[in-house]
Amino acid sequence: MAAAIASSLIRQKRQAREREKSNACKCVSSPSKGKTSCDKNKLNVFSRVKLFGSKKRRRRRPEPQLKGIVTKLYSRQGYHLQLQADGTIDGTKDEDSTYTLFNLIPVGLRVVAIQGVQTKLYLAMNSEGYLYTSELFTPECKFKESVFENYYVTYSSMIYRQQQSGRGWYLGLNKEGEIMKGNHVKKNKPAAHFLPKPLKVAMYKEPSLHDLTEFSRSGSGTPTKSRSVSGVLNGGKSMSHNEST
């Protein structure tokens, strides 16, 4: 079967070559004004050669785009969550503060990264329940977004929770507008409730996930960059040993 197909193809090619030769002879013997059918055949041949001889340009694949929002997060305690230039996380009554703007970037099903618009720092929670900020996106920067009653939203760590009860560790502000330890915040209390105030829809590149071990300090598992350890562990505010327990 394969041999028959091959011989048929060879025969077809031979016939095609013979037709091209006869057409070329007719073109030479009978010149006329304007373009002849022979000229058109030549143009077609040249165009095919140019087409197949040229290198195809590789189209750049568009980078993955994630549809998120630029928003403010209004706490039920009466404060706007803010992430200041030095990495401090707290609440403020100043609605016009540019540090209250956050990028909410979807990184999974009902999972978001919370990034300060001005600082480009990510909110994160470590294995002890402390909130801190990170220049790089790590697993500690992932928060589960859950809608509570009256359209309030809670944000809990994706990787840390109470070992025995399984209760989540939540982002929260106390009545003074201070950041709280995640394991001290209960989801049914006002401290954990935030009301997003979306300003616009935005498209984001998918953050590059970095391993915690690359940036952890020995014995802590908390990434530290230019800020002090005490500052990182309490949202940017110094903390005594008694306050940390």
Curated annotation (Swiss-Prot):
Q: What is the effect of changing R11P?
A: In DEE90; uncertain significance; loss of ability to induce SCN8A long-term inactivation; no effect on pro-excitatory properties; no effect on interaction with SCN8A
Please name the InterPro entries in this protein's record.
Fibroblast_GF_fam, IL1/FGF
Record keywords: Cell membrane, Cell projection, Cytoplasm, Disease variant, Epilepsy, Intellectual disability, Membrane, Microtubule, Neurogenesis, Nucleus, Phosphoprotein
Q: Where is this region: Disordered?
A: 1-36, 213-245
Q: Where is the composition biased (Polar residues)?
A: 215-245
Where would you say this protein principally sits, based on its record?
A: other
Q: Superkingdom, according to UniProt?
A: Eukaryota
This molecule's function is given as:
Microtubule-binding protein which directly binds tubulin and is involved in both polymerization and stabilization of microtubules. Through its action on microtubules, may participate in the refinement of axons by negatively regulating axonal and leading processes branching. Plays a crucial role in neuron polarization and migration in the cerebral cortex and the hippocampus. Regulates voltage-gated sodium channel transport and function. May also play a role in MAPK signaling.
Family annotation (PANTHER family):
FIBROBLAST GROWTH FACTOR (PTHR11486)
Query: What name appears for this protein in its UniProt entry?
Result: Fibroblast growth factor 13
**Gene symbol?**
FGF13
